[in-house]
Amino acid sequence: MAAHDDDMNRGIRPGRGSEDPAGQVAYLEQEIAVLRRKLAESPRHTRILEERIVELQTNLAGVSAQNERLAGTLREARDQIVALKEEVDRLAQPPAGFGVFLQANEDGTADIFTGGRKLRVNVSPSVELDELRRGQEVMLNEALNVVEAMEYESVGDIVTLKEILEDGERALVLGHTDEERVVRLAEPLRGLTIRPGDALLLEPRSGYVYEVVPKSEVEELVLEEVPDIGYEQIGGLGGQIEMIRDAVELPYLYPDLFREHELRPPKGVLLYGPPGCGKTLIAKAVANSLAKKVAEVTGQAAGKSFFLNIKGPELLNKYVGETERQIRLVFQRAREKASEGTPVIVFFDEMESLFRTRGSGVSSDVENTIVPQLLAEIDGVEGLQNVVVIGASNREDMIDPAILRPGRLDVKIKIERPDAEAAKDIFGKYLTERLPLHSDDLAEHEKDKSATVSSMIQTAVEQMYAESEENRFLEVTYANGDKEVLYFKDFNSGAMIENIVGRAKKMAIKDFLDKNQKGLRVSHLLQACVDEFKENEDLPNTTNPDDWARISGKKGERIVYIRTLVTGKQGADTGRSIDTVANTGQYL
């Protein structure tokens, strides 16, 4: 056995070439044992190798991800370096200047204005020279060459246009201290209709004006749109409407007949009367009706007229001459509109606030210059064609007589307080069949809405105009000792009727919400009349008794004493006397 091991150690396989079968068998058994041992160890070795492979693959994936992160970091660093370089280059560039383009030259250069100097510079190929316009802002490089076209200037000083010069490219303007200056018209103003008096935006360094700036102080006072109120929406003033239509519409619609009869159309109309009776409504309806008549005469689908609504008190200005200037601007605009053949209505509301009697001593005497300005505009050297002046006032006695004389405000129309018939007409404008009516009121008239509404109006008017104890308002004492009782009907107005209907509608809504009873009832109207009268109870407290004479139409005798006769809702007499007080209150 020892010999066999020695043979093995020497690399000699025992039994090979030996003729001893037993030795060969032993050798083979040893080989089999070795192979079996190796075969048993092979899976474990394979598993170790596989685990090693997995570990290496994991390490490889981690290294690859790390490489990707490093590559991404390098790319970001490179981008940041490039961006920083660009930022450094950008910050290192010299500043770019701006200038105003004046004109292009035949050699491809351009004349610009910059830094108070007029320069001739080159233009970058990236800028289309033919597309540059006069007054346009351009960007300049350090060599003062044009490298980019910009927008027009949008800020500057406000100047007033005096006139356009003959070349059509320059204008004479007035600054804020009334100094005159000749400026250039920028391209946006070329071809536009600009009028003397318009406010323009001036860039003072280059001397260009760029745009027309709306004049807020005049635009707020003037309403050019035609109101959408028609004569059919006005109740109880049929006679007055016919008079104003004859005065305003006929001269424009039939000018040949007026020339044939050598009849001069009226220049102005005065609407006077108590407040709330429809003076402003009529003036608005005149413009609307005139536009429709123009459409009929010209055959156009939609006629055109202008309604310049002048808010009288807002024209007053603390600076001397400003009010007169604004009046001139108003009539200048009216003449421009009328020169196109379009009728223009200039409406002065609350006319007595502007054109009071001169020398009356009841104001700051600004009317000493305002009234002559209006007179010069109405019938001065520069006449008015296709322009009608309409004034509205509830104190016509305070207007200067020179304005009211024939040839200026030729037609004077008094807007009376509504009588019973007129009140029915006014009620019919606000109380219509479209409104929800209560079933009980409808049942009394066999579900006839028209009959129900007519009955409600009749009942309300009868209560308003009844000379009953509940409707007594004032007892006036005249200077000759006579006394007269005035009722609420003597102070009724269209505005009051509208308010009464509004109160009744609100009562109907509250009844529906509280009692689930839907519809307007006659009781709502009657209660609304009582509430309206009750609210007017205290109005005489701040009124001069002389004003009541003008309101009631009894101007022949002076009122020296007034006593209220209002009966409260609980039946208590709340009558009291009112002595003569200063003329401070609003006029009923």
UniProtKB/Swiss-Prot annotation:
Which GO terms fall under molecular function for this chain's record? ATP binding; ATP hydrolysis activity
Q: Biased composition, Basic and acidic residues: where in the chain?
A: 1-10
Listed GO CC annotations: proteasome complex
How is this protein named in the record?
Proteasome-associated ATPase
The entry's function note states:
ATPase which is responsible for recognizing, binding, unfolding and translocation of pupylated proteins into the bacterial 20S proteasome core particle. May be essential for opening the gate of the 20S proteasome via an interaction with its C-terminus, thereby allowing substrate entry and access to the site of proteolysis. Thus, the C-termini of the proteasomal ATPase may function like a 'key in a lock' to induce gate opening and therefore regulate proteolysis.
Q: Which family does it belong to?
A: Belongs to the AAA ATPase family.
Q: Where is this region: Docks into pockets in the proteasome alpha-ring?
A: 587-588
Q: Which domain of life is it from?
A: Bacteria
- Region (Disordered) residue ranges read 1-23
Q: What is the lineage of its organism?
A: Bacteria, Bacillati, Actinomycetota, Actinomycetes, Kitasatosporales
Q: Coiled-coil region(s) at which residues?
A: 47-94
Q: Which UniProt keywords apply?
A: ATP-binding, Chaperone, Coiled coil, Nucleotide-binding, Proteasome
Subunit organization = Homohexamer. Assembles into a hexameric ring structure that caps the 20S proteasome core. Strongly interacts with the prokaryotic ubiquitin-like protein Pup through a hydrophobic interface; the interacting region of ARC lies in its N-terminal coiled-coil domain. There is one Pup binding site per ARC hexamer ring. Upon ATP-binding, the C-terminus of ARC interacts with the alpha-rings of the proteasome core, possibly by binding to the intersubunit pockets.
What the entry lists under Pfam families is as follows:
AAA, Prot_ATP_ID_OB_C, Prot_ATP_ID_OB_N
Q: What's in the domain note?
A: Consists of three main regions, an N-terminal coiled-coil domain that binds to protein Pup and functions as a docking station, an interdomain involved in ARC hexamerization, and a C-terminal ATPase domain of the AAA type.
Q: What InterPro entries does the record point to?
A: AAA+_ATPase, AAA_ATPase_domain, ATPase_AAA_core, ATPase_AAA_CS, NA-bd_OB-fold, P-loop_NTPase, Prot_ATP_ID_OB_2nd, Prot_ATP_ID_OB_N
Q: In which pathway does it act?
A: Protein degradation; proteasomal Pup-dependent pathway
* Residues holding ATP: G276, C277, G278, K279, T280, L281
Record's keyword annotation contains Nucleotide-binding: yes
Keyword hit for Chaperone? yes
User: What GO biological process, any one, is recorded here?
Assistant: proteasomal protein catabolic process
